[in-house]
Amino acid sequence: MFLNSLPTNFAALEVGQHLYWQIGNIRLHGQVFLTSWILLGALLVFISVGTKKMENDPKGLQNLLEFLWDYIRDLSRTQIGEKVYRDWMPFIGTLFLFVFVSNWGGALIPWRLIKLPSGELGAPTADINTTIALALLVSLSYFYAGLSNKGWRYFEYYVHPTPIMLPFKILEDFTKPLSLSFRLFGNILADELVVGVLVFLVPLVLPIPVMFLGLFTSAIQALIFATLAAYYIGEAVEEHH
């Protein structure tokens, strides 16, 4: 009976339609660029306003920004180590803030209500291409961290503590970006789908608590992504004895 009572166009509910940009033979997902530019622009304005008049007794936005700075500093120091964490703080902070504002932007802003000639907007991190690119960037970063700090000795990691570990360590280099990208993509996309279905079925009340849960999940996913990135870098620069 419940199934018969559903709207007849329920099957028309879609995950989303891409806004494509064609550059030569390359087709890009334009909605990722548009929403990323909007969110990054808003973040830059937020930071500019918060740091415009720095005070010894921070209040308001300056207080929030200093809290974020301290949090990212402590995260980097804990995961990477005292020796080189300062070199990687800007990278870890940028990752965290981009993923955070992308996730929250998808949870708070009704992108699909913005009408476009074709396609629709959505959270950048709800696109698998974005999360894979971020994960590959993390992989390149910990390779660079290991080689720049240890030189060719970095590859001793692959046979530590025994050469038997070599194939497993190589496999790990592939599973790290896969787990990073699919964890972030899956959680953000699932949240958008759940909210979309509930808005379709019960548009007034039921989606609100789910949206708050989505905000919490989005923040946790940004924290997990930044923490794992810092941990991988710390693992690469760690001296094995």
From Swiss-Prot:
This is ATP synthase subunit a. One of its GO terms (cellular component) is plasma membrane-derived thylakoid membrane. The lineage of its organism: Bacteria, Bacillati, Cyanobacteriota, Cyanophyceae, Synechococcales. Coiled coil: none annotated. GO terms for molecular function: proton-transporting ATP synthase activity, rotational mechanism. PROSITE patterns: ATPASE_A. The keyword Membrane applies. It holds the Pfam family ATP-synt_A.
